[in-house]
Every structure is written in structure tokens, then in C-alpha cells.
Amino acid sequence: MTEARPVEVRFGEDAGPSRTGISSRRDAYAAPSKLHLWVLLVLILSLISTFTVDTAAASLKFGAVPFSPGSTVRANVPLSPQEKSYAAQGGNPVPANAAAVLATPSNFDPTKSWPVLVICSTSDFKRQNRDDLADFYRRVGLSEGWVLLAGDGPQHAKNDNVAWRESMTMAAVDALHRSFPGSEKWPIACAGFSGGGKGVGYVAPFLAKNGCHVIGVYMTGANEDHLSDGYARLQPGPGFLNTPIYFSAGHEDRIATQEQQYAVVGMIKRTGFKRIRIGTFRGGHEVNDAQTSIALNWFRELAK
């Protein structure tokens, strides 16, 4: 008869699996392999990177209002004495602040330079600049890598005149410059549709007169030339005549016909503007996304 022997389990040395199939203590607490260390290192670095990005995004503020890249933020921003004097023209009560709206691409990093599209809307139907930003320009502008900006009063103006639009827009631009150091050097283009295409004729030279680097004016459905008058009144300097001007005209536009818009182009040429381009599209009195994309890319190309 075979003699029974006790099962021997050894600890403290590399004995390999025991006769019971249970690993030894050294196997159970074996040192991690190089692969495990690399995986752990990658996970740690990933967590640090994510935390850094999240912290940077959370620290972004526009006019003291926190926001994340890829979002649209609205902030109440102060008016300078000059902006208050403009706002008061036409008998308007001066508001305590302006309402500035900023839309940024998902990869927005304020330490880099960004082109800024400043929006001018018509005053018809009580539209505000921020309305046109959201309805007509935001999707294409962000996809093309632009920051979009609009300035309005906190309420509708009693007399929604050019001076009012200039003051509120400049307040938004000032807020941009205060929020992001170095942004005073960012290139700016101005866009206006219908009545906004007329108003932009004053807002663009006004911004240039006040030190902004204006690289383009984009007009859609404008049947009158106000840019020549804006240039004469505001006197931003002869260099402003080199600003690229892009006209977008719908074939079926009955409010601003192609004939009228080509006539406006002729007037602007006679004023002395040198870089003028007109694009047409199948459509009526509307902002065309493809034309917006062409205009923005043209401005950036010429600004290089």
C-alpha cells in the first residue's frame, strides 16, 4: 500500500506551482512587466493631458463669463465714454452696458491668432446683430475657422441708427481685446446682409479708424452704396481703399437686383476701392453659404 505523504507548500522562494495547483507567493506578487509599466505610463499621461485641456477650457472667459471652445457666449460689457457718446446720438438713452455675443470654433485657443467676423444686421423687423450671427453666418464661419462677434444694446434702441450700431459693435470688440491679450492684432472682416450690407459701409471704416486690422467687407443683397459715404465721413486713411470688398448677389433677388448691386460696385470703384469681387448664386434675397465660404477664404488669402 502506498504511503501517504503530506503536501509540501513552500513560501519565500520561487517554487513554481505547488502540487495543489496553487501558485507560490512569489508568483502571486510578481513584479510588473515592462508592458504593464508602459500601459500605466500612457494612462497617466492621458489623464494629465485631459485634465490640462479641461482646465484650460474652463478658464476661458469672455467679458467675465466662462465658456468652452465651440460654444456661443453672451456677456454684458461696458461702454467707453466715446461709445456712450455715439450711443446717445438721435436721442437714445445710454444703456448701462452693451450685449456682446462671441462664437468660437471647437479648437479655439486664444494664444493663437484668429480671424474675426464682425456681424452687422438690418434694423428692419427689429433684428439685432446677434440674430444674423446665429441665423446666417455661424455655421459656415466656424467651419472655416473664424471667430464670430456681434455687439448690440441690452434692449432695442429707440433710434436704431448707424451711431448706435457703431458704439455697440465697438464695445464688443473692446471686450474681445480685454478678454484675450494680443487679440487687438487679430484680423477682422465685417459682414452685412440687406440693410446690414448698408450699415457695414459705416461700421467697417469706423473699426479701421479705431485701430482694428480690417481685412475684408462682405456684402449680400446691398442695393445702395454706403461704403463710399462711410469712407468719406470717417476718414480711416487711404490704406482702407485696399480693403477687399466681396459682393454676393442672388440671381432671383427682387429686393436688391443684380443690376442694382453691379451699380453699387461701380460707385465703390469710382471712390477708389481697388480689390472688389462679385459672386452670384442661384437664389433670392438671402445669405448664401457657399458665397460666405468663398468670401472668407478670399479675405484670408489676401491677408497673408
What are these regions (language model features)?
Residues W38-T50:
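Bacterial N-terminal signal peptides
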Residues S106-S113, K158-G195, A208:
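Gly/Ser-rich "nucleophile elbow"/oxyanion-hole loop immediately N-terminal to the catalytic nucleophile
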Residues G216, G221-T292:
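The feature captures the conserved acid-bearing segment of alpha/beta-hydrolase catalytic domains
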Residues W186-G239:
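Primarily recognizes the serine-hydrolase "nucleophile elbow" in alpha/beta-hydrolase
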Residues T292-K304:
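Catalytic active-site module of serine/aspartate enzymes centered on a nucleophile-bearing elbow/loop
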Residues V116, C120-A172:
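Active-site machinery of serine-nucleophile hydrolases
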Residues A4, R10, A15-T20, D27-H36:
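Short, low-complexity intrinsically disordered segments enriched in A/P/G/S/L with frequent Arg
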Residues V53-W114, F206, A263-G266, I276, ...:
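A domain-start/cap signature at the N-terminus of enzymes
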